[in-house]
Design a protein with these regions (language model features):
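Structural signature of tandem-repeat unit edges
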Residues: 1-7, 17-32, 42-57, 67-82, ...
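Consensus positions within tandem repeat domains that build extended binding/scaffold surfaces
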Residues: 9-14, 34-39, 59-64, 84-89, ...
Length: 200
C-alpha cells in the first residue's frame, strides 16, 4: 500500500481467500481498517502493521476467520486506541500477537481474539492505557500449548475484565493483577485449567 493511503473501508478485500500477503510497510498514514475489510481472507499468513504509526482503529470482524494467519504485529501502532469486536475471531492458526508499545490502546472489544485455538503469545508491554478487556475477548483459546506470558501486572490502567473474557483459554502459571483492577466479569476465567495462582 502507498504512503498516502489513509483508510481501508469496510469489506474492501472481504472473501479474497487466495490473498496471501499484504504489504503495509509504507502505509504510515493509514488511520483505519474498516468493518470486515479482510473478512475470511483464509490465505493470509502474516500481518505486520508495525509501520502503521498513524493507525487509530481496527473495525469489527476486520480479519475474522483468516484461518491461516499465524502472527500479528502491532508493535509500532502507538496511536491505536481500539481493536473492534470479533476482529480476529476464528483465526485458528494464530500463534503470536504483539501489542507492545500500543500506549494509546484503551479497549480490546468483545470476542476480539476468541476461538484462536493455537494462541501461545500475547505481548502487552507498554499497553499503559488499556482499561477494558471485553466480553469473551480471549475465550476458547484452548491450545495444546500454554499461554504463559500474558502479564496482567504490567497493565496498570486495567479496570474491567468482561464476562467470559478468558473462559476455556490456555492461560497458564501465576496470574497477578495491577492494583487498579475493579471488576472481573461472570465466568471471566472459568475453565482455565492451567492457572496455578492468582494475586490481587
Amino acid at each position: 500500500f502507498p504512503k498516502a493511503l489513509e483508510m481501508i473501508d469496510q469489506e474492501a478485500f472481504s472473501g479474497c481467500n487466495t490473498l496471501t500477503e499484504i504489504d503495509f510497510s509504507k502505509a504510515t498514514q493509514l488511520r483505519s481498517i474498516g468493518h470486515r475489510a479482510f473478512y475470511e481472507c483464509s490465505g493470509l499468513r502474516d500481518l505486520d502493521l508495525s509501520a502503521c504509526t498513524s493507525l487509530v482503529g481496527i473495525g469489527s470482524n476486520a480479519f475474522y476467520r483468516c484461518s491461516n494467519l499465524q502472527a500479528v504485529n502491532f508493535s509500532g501502532c502507538g496511536k491505536l486506541t481500539s481493536i473492534g469486536s470479533y476482529a480476529f475471531q476464528y483465526c485458528s492458526s494464530l500463534r503470536t500477537v504483539d501489542l507492545s508499545n500500543c500506549s494509546a490502546l484503551v479497549t480490546l472489544e468483545s470476542y476480539v481474539f476468541s476461538d484462536c485455538s493455537n494462541l501461545t503469545s500475547v505481548g502487552l508491554a507498554g499497553c499503559t492505557a488499556l482499561t477494558t478487556i471485553g466480553e469473551g475477548a480471549f475465550n476458547n483459546n484452548y491450545s495444546s500449548s500454554q499461554l504463559s506470558d500474558f502479564d496482567f501486572s504490567q497493565l496498570t490502567a486495567l479496570k474491567d475484565i468482561g464476562e467470559s473474557a478468558f473462559s476455556n483459554s490456555a492461560l497458564a502459571g501465576d496470574i497477578a493483577f495491577a492494583s487498579g483492577i475493579t471488576q472481573l466479569g461472570r465466568n471471566a476465567f472459568s475453565g482455565c485449567r492451567n492457572i496455578t495462582s492468582v494475586d490481587f
